[in-house]
Amino acid sequence: MDISDASTACDQVLDTVKGAVIADDEFFERIMLGVLARGHVLLEDVPGTGKTLTARSIAQALGLSFSRVQFTPDLLPSDVTGTNIFNEQDRSFEFSEGPIFANIVLADEINRAPPKTQAALLEAMEEGQVTVDGETHQLPKPFFVIATQNPVEQEGTFPLPEAQVDRFSVKTAIGYPELDGEVELLRRRAGRDTRSPTVETVLTQDQVLAMRATPERVRVHDDLLQYMAEITQATRNDRRVAVGVSPRGTQRMFETARARAVYAGREFVTPDDVKRVSHPVLAHRLVLTPDAKVSDVDKADVVDDVLDSVDVPTVEFEAR
């Protein structure tokens, strides 16, 4: 699959998903960038905005298997990864796969699970495998996690450690629909017999794997590499930031910028690609100082100030 075909495939997937989910184009783009960049997405939003429907619809459109895990305080790691069960017939243990063995996994309200269970998901996200009783099991490919957390209810939750937040390539939110969007939501509900809409499959699993490989062929000018490094360096020098973007975050920005180029149907990354992915990729990686938190500093404003402080290179590429 070439870059033009991958861009067309992205449009087809999102056009199909938009028939089921009502949200703005920026939200859909960010989800698709997570898929293309072979990363994972963190959704922080209130209940009832369509997070589960979005994850299920993306899976259906991509022709991938889908699994939903409701995280609770009593959820054990084995409830997510699976466990070894004794088979009395042949007197041996057999591995029973947990719900994480799917192409797209919705980790719902991930911050309600204890740290040990969160850590089990951490290995799966980073390594594409799980370890149970010392034995390693490979997860299906592609493997993509959409995790959600409720920003309002904090009682009885276990905030995600910075190491785990850093594993998510993109963080975004659906938000409430506009008035016209909510009316359209009701109109669609009135036109079907079931509560949840269905989505047509537009790609196969092999096509998804091929599509996710296309960003590796995108060209990135050396000046843009310098630009991205200067942006992340600037986050570490901001007086409002206690912990800036990690080197892993710099790599994720690079990967997501390439994915943005594919999404736009280009063979090369532009400065606008870097700017466009900066907020969803960088903001959630920042740890603010206590004074900044007391002053109610918005991480998005920090990213804006950083982008304004770094000189934008002039880069020109000729299409092949």
Regions found by a protein language model. Name each.
Residues 87-92, 127-203, 208-216, 258-263:
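Canonical AAA+ ATPase core
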Residues 3-7, 157, 174-245, 266, ...:
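Conserved C-terminal "switch" segment of AAA+ ATPases
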Residues 237-320:
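C-terminal engagement/docking regions of AAA+ P-loop ATPases
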Residues 35-73, 77, 86:
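Walker A/P-loop
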Residues 45, 108-109, 120:
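Walker B catalytic acidic pair
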Residues 31-32, 86-106, 135:
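Conserved alpha-helical scaffold flanking the Walker A/P-loop in AAA+ ATPase domains
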Residues 4-41, 46:
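Pre-Walker A (pre-P-loop) alpha-helix and adjacent loop at the N terminus of AAA/AAA+ ATPase modules
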Residues 46, 80, 148:
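P-loop (Walker A) phosphate-binding loop of NTP-binding proteins
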